[in-house]
Amino acid sequence: PQSIEHYLEVLDAFIEREITPLENQDDNIRFFDHRREHARTDWDRDGLPSEEWETLLTEMRRRADTAGHFRYALPEAYGGQNGTNLAMARIREHLAEKGLGLHNDLQNENSIVGNLMTPMVLHDFGTPEQQSRWMEPMLTGALGWCFGLTESAHGSDATWMETRAERAIHNGVSGWRITGEKMWTTGLHKASHVLVFARHSGHQGSASGIGCFVVPTDAAGFEVG
């Protein structure tokens, strides 16, 4: 559709005006040229992303959000533009075609038009109270979120998982007790909450009986190995 092609022109103008100058400022280009892996990595913290790299990404997202692009896929009620799947596919293709840069980096899913998987999950399946409490802080970065799906014995096949959720009462409060382990939980080092996928019913190999649980990283029993 022509409306999508026009929006690509709007994005290109924004990149030229706001993002490219930031990319070239203070040798930030080191995060995208042949030095990028070393520049992005804090080797003294077991290979976590460097603070300088994450600070730059935060500023990119702030500028994109201020300009109205970062939340494109979300409904207008959350500052988005009701972006369709078709539009998102075309935008990602266009930005990737421009090459590696601060505007778009498929290596770590950062882009001026956010691939907002976690907010979309909360919007589509969360309760109104959850949306009111977490959606905006999640989008601004005030709260860090990630998700736990992959397990060492089963990969990302979510129909086979050993993580279990059972109803329980703790200190008089009804909830869930989750037991299991996850791996490759990108972003956990700064996350306040994790979306943990666990089986609460059904049998291994079944697509039903799997739930997604919001788990605070300071919850009792939560450990990072």
Residue ranges with predicted function:
Residues 1-112, 129-133, 137:
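Amphipathic, small/basic residue-rich leader segments at the start of a protein or domain
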Residues 77, 150-154, 183-184:
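Short, solvent-exposed loop/turn elements at beta->coil junctions and helix N-caps
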Residues 106-129, 155:
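N-terminal glycine-rich flavin-associated loop
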Residues 134, 161, 183, 224-225:
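Short beta-alpha junctions and helix-cap segments that line functional grooves
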Residues 141-149:
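A short, Trp-centered hydrophobic/proline-enriched beta-strand micro-motif
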Residues 153-162:
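Active-site-adjacent elements of ketosynthase-type condensing enzymes
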Residues 163-167:
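A structural signal for short hydrophobic beta-strand segments in well-ordered beta-sheet cores
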Residues 174-175, 179-224:
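A short core secondary-structure module
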